[in-house]
Amino acid sequence: MGVNQVIKLKDLLTEGKITSDVDRAAKKIGIKFKKKVKTKFTNDFTGPNEKGENVKYDSWMDYNPKNYESQGRALVDALSSKYIRLKHNTYASGGSAVFINRKKDPKTKFTISYARSMSGPYISYEGVKGQ
């Protein structure tokens, strides 16, 4: 194996760390996410005067969990020990929290939301794919 192949293999092993941490913490709590990927055209990561790019986002949801509020808070608490919590909002019907892994890298920002909507309760995760 050459040096380039070892570096590429290491990049593959470390890719998806946030998503695997969220998935592992959710499984321990009893949350089963339905995983979807959506694409968004944005210039959030390139700069205000530069051309935008297509960015893939992981958009996971668990529809109709048993105790959405306690499970959502437990997931936020589990992730708070490892990631920096930027914002925590509480609403009458739920709440949300915004986390970041590295402050210098905006692609490592992700959101956990839990609420009761008109269509039923849900818990969701949204973040850049591959982070």
Where are these regions (language model features)?
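Terminal leader/tail segments of proteins
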Residues: 2-7, 19, 52, 117
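Cleaved targeting-peptide boundary
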Residues: 16-23
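Acidic, low-complexity, intrinsically disordered interaction modules
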Residues: 41, 45-124
